Structure formats: C-alpha cells, structure tokens
C-alpha cells in the first residue's frame, strides 16, 4: 500500500442551516471550519461523502 492514493479537500461553505446529515458528513471528512484542509485516502466511500457535500467542499489536490 505504498502507492495509496490520497485526496486533499478544503471546506468552502458553512454547515449552518444545512441538514444534519450534511453536517455529520463534514465531521466525517474531518472538516469543521471554513478554510480547513484535510488529506484522506481516495476510496469510494470518501468520494461518496464528497459528492454528498460537493457544494460545501472543493478538491485541492489528488495524488
């Protein structure tokens, strides 16, 4: 697993006035403040979470 792909995402939107599931998804992605950047493994589960909150996050870098 030395060549494990990662994806870097940044939170660009606020979870205020969003559904509880979207707020929980942001927490699951380790995001809790606008401007925060996190690096996660590029798996189908993480991609699905990003799709769920695509209006609140942006992909910074894919390795």
UniProtKB/Swiss-Prot annotation:
Name a single GO biological process.
translation
Question: What is this protein's name?
Answer: Large ribosomal subunit protein uL30
Tell me how this protein assembles: Part of the 50S ribosomal subunit.
Q: Which residues form a coiled coil?
A: none
UniProt keywords (A-Z) are: Ribonucleoprotein, Ribosomal protein
Q: Which InterPro entries match?
A: Ribo_uL30_ferredoxin-like_sf (IPR036919), Ribosomal_uL30_bac-type (IPR005996), Ribosomal_uL30_ferredoxin-like (IPR016082)
Q: Which GO terms describe its cellular component?
A: cytosolic large ribosomal subunit
